[in-house]
């Protein structure tokens, strides 16, 4: 909980941060989209085409597009729960009628370089000039995440880069998804493993 408070205190100082309230234009939103008060959209690229939300979707969590790349596309009638954080520097595509529960984390990249010297340089740049000063990803690896239609991601799940979750799949609470999930299957655990067909 302490990390979350620090994270949001840093984010809120960013000029590209938008705390969603009444009638705040932040992205390309179709008719009937609801952005709940307290949700957040951080679009470091300040380009509305980088965050697209389909009609009748409900966003209670946070959507973040990094300054050096990324795109988030959410289909129609999908739900992003409170405390969920979806962060992209490559591409995250979420289908129609997807349920993403509270406190889910979806990240399409490593977040940091693997070499400690490179991490130190990046960290110092962020401290001195802000996260939005990063204009390239350096050696951070990113791979597209795809979540197909009618998927249910239960609470406290982590989905890592390069994962493709097939249509109608369910990911059990607290799972860490590092590999593709077949359509109409239930996976759970750390790492997430096949449990049964649906």
Please place each PLM-identified region on the residue numbering.
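Domain-scale signature associated with acetyltransferase and cell-envelope carbohydrate enzymes
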Residues: 1-114, 118-125, 131-132, 137-150, ...
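Nucleotide-sugar donor-binding/catalytic module of glycosyltransferases
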Residues: 164
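A generic "structured core" feature
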Residues: 170, 175-176
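Gly/Pro- and small hydrophobic-enriched strand-loop and loop-to-helix capping segments
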Residues: 178-184
């Amino acid at each position: 909980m302490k990390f979350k408070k620090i994270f949001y205190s840093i984010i809120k100082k960013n000029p590209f941060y938008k705390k969603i309230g009444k009638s705040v234009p932040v992205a390309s939103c179709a008719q009937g989209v609801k952005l709940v008060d307290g949700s957040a959209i951080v679009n470091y690229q300040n380009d509305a085409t980088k965050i697209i939300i389909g009609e009748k979707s409900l966003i209670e969590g946070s959507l973040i597009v990094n300054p050096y790349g990324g795109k988030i596309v959410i289909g129609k009638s999908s739900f992003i729960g409170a405390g969920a954080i979806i962060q992209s520097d490559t591409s995250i595509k979420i289908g129609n009628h997807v349920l993403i529960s509270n406190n889910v984390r979806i990240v399409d990249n490593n977040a940091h370089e693997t070499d400690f010297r490179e991490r130190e340089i990046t960290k110092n740049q962020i401290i001195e000039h802000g996260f939005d000063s990063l204009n390239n990803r350096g050696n951070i690896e990113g791979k597209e995440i795809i979540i197909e239609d009618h998927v249910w991601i239960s609470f406290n799940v982590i989905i890592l880069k390069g994962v493709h979750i097939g249509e109608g799949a369910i990911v059990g609470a607290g799972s860490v998804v590092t590999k593709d999930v077949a359509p109409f299957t239930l996976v759970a655990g750390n790492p997430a493993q096949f449990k049964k067909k649906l």
